[in-house]
């Protein structure tokens, strides 16, 4: 009988370095059986809404995410079943009609600002991480990402950060830190923490293979 996959949850504020940590762990297992499940792709489908209304969506609130679908997909992957992972179009502010076929793997990384917010998702995780990074650095990273990758202006990113992102972080994201098994400061630059995580994952995999 095949052993259960190892699930790692990686949470933290926008621009904290979650993706860097995720990519670092992924690279360490390159060539092995590992996949990434990005919460950013699981924003709720808004294709039925006018574009102007979609622009008002608060993407930093827990209710913006389709956690029901993410939970369903994670359960399928834990049963070694394939899924059709959604694609989110950040320029159109809605879910794409296309999907990505994903085969199950032995290691699953769930990454997102609210990766630890939903109890159902947490209960499926073997290791829960929170990436803790200074707020000034997080806003700089967010500006760079949203202007380059999501077609946003600098002014709109800053306005959104002050009016939405920062208060949502303080109210909803920061409190999920208490659910973390490990808190990683300085994101992807903390190579010691990442190496320790890789060792822990390998230990769990070996124990389940015995």
Swiss-Prot record:
GO terms classed as biological process: CTP salvage; UMP salvage
Major localization listed first in the record, in broad terms: cytoplasm
Involved pathway(s): Pyrimidine metabolism; CTP biosynthesis via salvage pathway; CTP from cytidine: step 1/3; Pyrimidine metabolism; UMP biosynthesis via salvage pathway; UMP from uridine: step 1/1
GO cellular component, one term: cytoplasm
PANTHER family attached to this UniProt entry: URIDINE KINASE
Subcellular location: Cytoplasm
Record-listed ATP binding positions: 12-19
Protein family (similarity comment): Belongs to the uridine kinase family.
Database matches in Pfam families: PRK
Keywords annotated in UniProt: ATP-binding, Cytoplasm, Kinase, Nucleotide-binding, Transferase
MF GO annotations: ATP binding; cytidine kinase activity; uridine kinase activity
Gene, per the UniProt record: udk
Protein name: Uridine kinase
Domain of life of the source: Bacteria
Gene3D superfamilies, A to Z: P-loop containing nucleotide triphosphate hydrolases
The reaction(s) this protein catalyses: uridine + ATP = UMP + ADP + H(+); cytidine + ATP = CMP + ADP + H(+)
Enzyme class label: transferase
Listed HAMAP family: Uridine_kinase
Enzyme Commission (EC) number: 2.7.1.48
């Amino acid at each position: 009988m095949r052993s259960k996959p190892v699930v790692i949850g990686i949470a933290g504020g926008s621009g904290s370095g979650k993706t860097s940590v995720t990519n670092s762990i992924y690279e360490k297992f390159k060539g092995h059986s590992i996949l990434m499940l990005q919460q950013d792709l699981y924003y709720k489908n808004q294709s039925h809404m006018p574009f102007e209304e979609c622009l008002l969506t608060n993407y930093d609130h827990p209710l913006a995410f389709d956690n029901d679908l993410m939970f369903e997909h994670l359960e399928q992957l834990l049963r070694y079943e394939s899924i059709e992972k959604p694609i989110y179009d950040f320029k159109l502010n809605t879910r794409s009609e296309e999907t990505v076929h994903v085969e199950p793997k032995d290691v699953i990384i769930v990454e997102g600002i609210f990766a630890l917010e939903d109890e159902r998702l947490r209960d499926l995780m073997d290791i829960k991480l929170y990436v803790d990074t200074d707020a000034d650095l997080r806003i700089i990273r967010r500006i760079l990402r949203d202007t380059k990758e999501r077609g946003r202006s600098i002014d709109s990113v800053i306005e959104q950060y002050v009016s939405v992102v920062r208060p949502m972080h303080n109210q909803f994201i920061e409190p999920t830190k208490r659910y973390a098994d490990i808190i990683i400061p300085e994101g992807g630059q903390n190579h010691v923490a990442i190496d320790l995580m890789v060792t822990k994952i390998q230990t769990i995999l070996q124990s389940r293979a015995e």
